[in-house]
């Protein structure tokens, strides 16, 4: 889809699953150290009911999924940030619940802002992302 065809309010959805193998690959690549991942018996004592996925792993997978959607296949994408930029209405990244390896997730990408560049054939899209676990319909 070309930049000019995107409209504020458009919504695109996809489903993803991050399994235990994906989790191990992420931990190996990111070199993430977290006692809840390294000591499952301690995690279980703390009420963790499985392989808890790191938030950054979820963000990476959700961003990667967006690049594979046909709608964005002709786009150059950059992650500008998730830090409450006042130009983007101070949006932040926050998780509302836990995600475990094997959870099936629905990811909703919505175009929340569009700023045209000089030629009108390119510009910046702001994409809001919401994640929902399919099994219990919980927003994450």
Q: Where do the model's predicted regions map?
A:
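A beta-strand/beta-hairpin structural motif
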Residues: 88-94
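HotDog/MaoC-like acyl-thioester-processing domains
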Residues: 1-11, 95-140
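Hot-dog-fold acyl-thioester-processing enzymes
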Residues: 1-88
């Amino acid at each position: 889809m070309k930049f000019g065809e995107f409209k504020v309010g458009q919504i695109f959805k996809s489903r993803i699953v991050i399994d235990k193998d994906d989790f191990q690959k992420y931990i190996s690549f990111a070199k993430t150290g977290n006692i809840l991942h390294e000591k499952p018996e301690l995690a279980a004592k703390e009420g963790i009911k499985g392989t808890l996925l790191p938030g950054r792993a979820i963000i990476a997978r959700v961003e990667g999924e967006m690049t594979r959607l046909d709608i964005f296949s002709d786009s150059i994408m950059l992650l500008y940030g998730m830090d409450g930029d006042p130009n983007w209405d101070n949006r932040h990244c926050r998780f509302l619940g836990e995600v475990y390896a094997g959870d099936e997730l629905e990811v909703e990408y919505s175009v929340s802002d569009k700023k045209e560049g000089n030629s009108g054939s390119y510009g910046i899209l702001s994409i809001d992302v919401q994640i929902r676990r399919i099994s219990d319909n919980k927003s994450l």
